[in-house]
Amino acid sequence: MPKGPLVAIVDDDESIRDTTKDLLESAGFSAAVFARAASLLKSRRLSRVSCLIADMRMPKMTGLELHQHLVASNRGIPTILMTAYPNERTQAQAIKADVVCYLIKPFAADELLACVRCAMQRHDVGGE
């Protein structure tokens, strides 16, 4: 198992979670997957997360709401949001919320990895 920085993946689609986890681990990152935002928030691993990748559309709490909740709780984690249903309103909300990247599914593996590296730099600079 990779020993690199921990990336949390929150998506209600199991295939997306598994594929993203495999990609990140092959690039040297550690990854933890969660089907719901609440599962991440209850996890003991939350304090170790260096980057969050979350789906915009999930039941109960969206990826953007999760990001905003973490920021409001003084647990700001550099966040990458992904969606299969892009629209200008949610993209503007994501930018205003200072997410690292807003990815439209399907996206290239290199695009996601570039966003993760950017998030890691932001995490290191922020001293989290």
Model-derived regions: residue spans:
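Acidic, metal-coordinating helix/loop segments flanking the phosphotransfer/catalytic sites
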Residues: 33-51
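Acidic catalytic/metal-coordinating carboxylates
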Residues: 35-36, 62-66
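Alpha4 helix (beta4-alpha4-beta5 surface) of REC/receiver domains from two-component response regulators
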Residues: 65, 86-101
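C-terminal output helix
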Residues: 89, 107-117
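Two-component/phosphorelay signaling modules centered on CheY-like receiver
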Residues: 14-32
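Receiver (REC) domain active-site loop signature in two-component systems and cognate sites
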Residues: 58
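The C-terminal output helix
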Residues: 117-128
